[in-house]
């Protein structure tokens, strides 16, 4: 399973590194996801949740 936020749907983004000579190489920007237990349909479940979703109170740990 991909490391994608269960609540917000955030996923890693891709782009390029650019050197001083403007050469480009592919890179990815990861997201800060934590594996936490939350209630899903009334039952506890371990899912990947972004740190921002946890801080903003969109989800509550069990």
Curated annotation (Swiss-Prot):
Q: Name one GO biological process term.
A: translation
Give the superkingdom in one word: Bacteria
The SS bond pairs are: none
State the UniProt keywords alphabetically: Ribonucleoprotein, Ribosomal protein
Q: Which GO terms describe its molecular function?
A: structural constituent of ribosome
Sequence segments annotated as region (Disordered):
1-26
Q: Sorted alphabetically, which InterPro entries does this protein's record hold?
A: Bacterial_rp_bL28, Ribosomal_bL28, Ribosomal_bL28/bL31-like_sf, Ribosomal_bL28_bact-type, Ribosomal_bL28_sf
Q: Name one Pfam family in it.
A: Ribosomal_L28
Give the transmembrane region(s).
none
Its GO CC terms? ribonucleoprotein complex; ribosome
The keyword Transmembrane helix appears for this protein: no
Q: Where is the composition biased (Polar residues)?
A: 11-20
Look up keyword Ribonucleoprotein and say if it applies. yes
**What family is it from?**
Belongs to the bacterial ribosomal protein bL28 family.
NCBIfam families linked: L28 (TIGR00009)
Q: What is this protein called?
A: Large ribosomal subunit protein bL28
Organism from which the protein derives: Exiguobacterium sibiricum (strain DSM 17290 / CCUG 55495 / CIP 109462 / JCM 13490 / 255-15)
Gene this chain is encoded by: rpmB
């Amino acid at each position: 399973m991909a490391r994608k936020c269960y609540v917000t749907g955030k996923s890693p983004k891709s782009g390029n590194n650019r050197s001083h000579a403007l050469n480009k190489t592919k890179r990815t920007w990861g997201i800060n996801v934590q594996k936490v237990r939350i209630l899903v349909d009334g039952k506890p479940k371990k899912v990947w949740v972004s740190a921002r979703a946890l801080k903003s109170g969109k989800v509550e740990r069990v």
